[in-house]
Amino acid sequence: MSEKRFPRLTTDIIIQIRGSQEHIVLVKRKFPPEGWAIPGGFVEYGETVEEAAQREAQEETSLQVQLLRQFHVYSDPQRDPRGHTASVVFIASAEGVPVAQDDAAEVQVFHRDHLPSPMAFDHSQILSDYFSGYY
């Protein structure tokens, strides 16, 4: 009998900045898969998804975020080329200037009409859902 496998739990944080839903923080990944991404990462053992979201946001952008609400869960088995993940996506707000840290090679604030490419994972779909008001 084969051993059961389970998806890894991750979190992604859509960080609104400058008091606007039109401006968000994105990171350029330092490691594969390459591209721009919504800040986020794996939930560590003993940590809630909310704690993981706040930790990952700070680790990658240096920003202290205020979580506003849970947005959606994205769990397509093909969403991450490294393996099956399920991501709890949050909407958060922050003040200040983001600074790239940890596994982020670069961090920038983008207006919804000027998003970079390529985007990693399924983050283009997540942002499309967010900006279209898919709640």
Language-model segments: what does each one mean?
Residues 21-60:
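Conserved Nudix-box catalytic region and its N-terminal flanking loop in Nudix hydrolases
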Residues 89-91, 99-132:
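NUDIX/MutT-family hydrolases
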Residues 5-7, 34, 84-86:
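Residue-level preference for beta-strand/loop junctions
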Residues 63-72:
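A short coil-to-beta-strand element that immediately follows conserved catalytic motifs
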Residues 1-24, 91:
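Conserved N-terminal beta-strand and adjoining loop/helix that marks the start
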Residues 41, 55-56, 68, 110-113:
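Structural detector for helix-capping/boundary residues
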Residues 17, 74-98, 130, 134:
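Active-site-adjacent beta-strand/loop module that shapes the phosphate/pyrophosphate-binding cleft
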Residues 31, 43, 74, 94, ...:
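Hydrophobic pocket-lining residues within nucleotide cofactor-binding pockets
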